[in-house]
């Protein structure tokens, strides 16, 4: 059934990710392992090659790698426990057949019904099968931190990727510098630990740099990783407001209200405006046991005395008399009380 005018394009959101019935325990252990790996490699770095450089007067290396380690560790731990933009679950009172439409820059979006969260999802909001939640501006589910990346923690995710790139590069440069300075010395424990730290740092550096580049391109186009993977906006992206405005909205604009702290309106004060269209319920469906009859004259049921069709009988006649307009007659003694006009056929 057409709901809007033909001039407005109605867009349907991409198909949801398949439900994955996995336990939270393995993913949580993997996220904890990543934090432990960061602490372990950093401990080896600061305890062996960096210590030797400091003892020989090279203070520039710990002055650079120290703050980068603190920033990386803080962003990694914070991202594990951050709120990606979880929306409140609905109730069973909401009708899933009701059609809700919003318009964004002359592009109409039909709000899809989430059968798990029991509400109509706003634009760019998707249900994560791993976390079993609906996330506003869903980007992707990061298994490294066992958390979704969405509207409220995307900046923290970008900070983590950037700090990991810089920290991995600083570790690699420092370890190579240490190996070059000690090339004339025999093999020692410090050299072994430097090689042990430099190999994983070099292995993580290239993938992290590519990930940072991909995320930067996505922010420039105002397109999330999930939308880019599904080719959600192949021709025209209504959320694209230009290079500078896209970066401002993604990294510096106010985040708006936290939907997990209190029930608030889904309209954000900053960002792309949503215009709520008129809500129209879905057309009624014919029950399965009621089938239309064959074409042509239909059989009429026999009338039983005292059981006529609706709108007939004595009660209907009384209602008809009550609906008749009342007239006010004037008399020399004053106005008389209103009387109903007699129906046709009455004496």
UniProtKB/Swiss-Prot annotation:
One of its GO terms (biological process) is positive regulation of aggrephagy. It comes from the Eukaryota. GO terms for cellular component: endoplasmic reticulum; Golgi membrane; perinuclear region of cytoplasm; perinucleolar compartment. Its EC number is 2.3.1.225. It is an enzyme of class 2 (transferase). Residues 112-162 form the DHHC domain. Residues 275-347 are annotated as: Disordered. The DHHC domain is required for palmitoyltransferase activity. This is Palmitoyltransferase ZDHHC19. It comes from Mus musculus. The gene is Zdhhc19.
């Amino acid at each position: 059934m057409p709901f809007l005018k033909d001039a407005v394009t109605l867009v349907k959101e991409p198909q949801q990710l398949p439900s994955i019935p996995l336990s939270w325990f393995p993913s949580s252990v993997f996220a904890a392992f990543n934090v432990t790996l960061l602490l372990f490699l950093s401990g080896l770095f600061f305890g062996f090659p960096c210590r030797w450089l400091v003892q020989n007067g090279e203070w520039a290396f710990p002055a650079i790698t120290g703050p980068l380690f603190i920033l990386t560790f803080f962003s990694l731990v914070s991202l594990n426990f951050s709120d990606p933009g979880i929306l409140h679950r609905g109730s069973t009172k909401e009708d899933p057949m009701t059609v809700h439409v919003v318009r964004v820059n002359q592009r109409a979006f039909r709000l899809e019904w989430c059968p798990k969260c029991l509400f109509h999802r706003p634009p760019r909001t998707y249900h994560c099968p791993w976390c079993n939640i609906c996330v506003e501006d869903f980007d992707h589910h990061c298994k490294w931190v066992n958390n979704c990346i969405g509207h409220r923690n995307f900046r923290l995710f970008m900070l983590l990727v950037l700090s990991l790139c810089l920290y991995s590069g600083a570790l690699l440069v420092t370890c190579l510098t240490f190996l070059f300075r000690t090339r004339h010395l025999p093999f020692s424990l410090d050299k072994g630990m430097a090689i042990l730290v430099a190999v994983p740092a070099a292995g993580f550096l290239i993938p992290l740099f590519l990930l940072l580049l991909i995320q930067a391109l996505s922010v420039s186009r105002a397109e999330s990783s999930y939308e880019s993977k599904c080719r959600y906006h192949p021709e025209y992206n209504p959320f694209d407001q230009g290079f500078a405005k896209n970066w401002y909205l993604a990294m510096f604009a106010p985040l708006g209200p936290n939907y997990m702290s209190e029930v608030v309106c889904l309209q954000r004060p900053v960002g792309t405006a949503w215009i709520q269209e008129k809500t129209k319920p879905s057309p009624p469906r014919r029950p399965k046991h009621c089938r239309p009859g064959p074409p042509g004259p239909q059989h009429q049921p026999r009338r039983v005395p005292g059981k006529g069709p609706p709108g007939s009988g004595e009660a209907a006649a009384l209602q008809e008399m009550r609906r008749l307009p009342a007239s006010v007659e004037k008399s020399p003694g004053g106005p008389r009380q209103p009387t109903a006009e007699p129906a046709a056929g009455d004496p």
